[in-house]
UniProtKB/Swiss-Prot annotation:
Polar residues bias spans: 97-112
Function field: Escorts unspliced or incompletely spliced viral pre-mRNAs (late transcripts) out of the nucleus of infected cells. These pre-mRNAs carry a recognition sequence called Rev responsive element (RRE) located in the env gene, that is not present in fully spliced viral mRNAs (early transcripts). This function is essential since most viral proteins are translated from unspliced or partially spliced pre-mRNAs which cannot exit the nucleus by the pathway used by fully processed cellular mRNAs. Rev itself is translated from a fully spliced mRNA that readily exits the nucleus.
GO terms of biological process kind: mRNA transport; viral process
Domain comment quoted from the record: The RNA-binding motif binds to the RRE, a 240 bp stem-and-loop structure present in incompletely spliced viral pre-mRNAs. This region also contains the NLS which mediates nuclear localization via KPNB1 binding and, when the N-terminal sequence is present, nucleolar targeting. These overlapping functions prevent Rev bound to RRE from undesirable return to the nucleus. When Rev binds the RRE, the NLS becomes masked while the NES remains accessible. The leucine-rich NES mediates binding to human XPO1.
Matching InterPro entries: REV_protein
Sequence segments annotated as region (Disordered): 24-49, 82-123
Summary of subunit composition and partner proteins: Homomultimer; when bound to the RRE. Multimeric assembly is essential for activity and may involve XPO1. Binds to human KPNB1, XPO1, TNPO1, RANBP5 and IPO7. Interacts with the viral Integrase. Interacts with human KHDRBS1. Interacts with human NAP1; this interaction decreases Rev multimerization and stimulates its activity. Interacts with human DEAD-box helicases DDX3 and DDX24; these interactions may serve for viral RNA export to the cytoplasm and packaging, respectively.
Identification of the protein by name: Protein Rev
Lineage of origin: Viruses, Riboviria, Pararnavirae, Artverviricota, Revtraviricetes
Motif (Nuclear localization signal and RNA-binding (RRE)): 34-50
Motif position, Nuclear export signal and binding to XPO1: 73-84
PTM-bearing positions, type Phosphoserine: S5, S8
Amino acid sequence: MAGGSGNSDEELLRAVRIIKILYQSNPYPSPEGSRQARRNRRRRWRARQRQINSLSERILSTCLERPTGPVSLPLPPIERLTLDSAEDIGTGGTDPPQGTETGTGSPNTPEGHSTILGTGAKN
């Protein structure tokens, strides 16, 4: 799309055409026949759709050269990881949790939900 990426654009268009052909090659089954026959045809159609979906993902990931697995995030050393959120308040320029500056909670806090849930439980 920009500069010298014309070759990759052509590859992407080619991949999209292939995927379109794959989806067009698997039309929805006809509504004729007995209930069991229609159910079996739909079941087989869904199985083919799943295969086409996985093939399409593989084609696009190959074309775009994306990793198929999840991308790992860089984490700090295990010694620096804590479960106590009180240590994190005021460090690193992070915003304090809602309601700590003014002392009032917002309706989205768990306290607000417990009030709503409490009224329903009394009925």
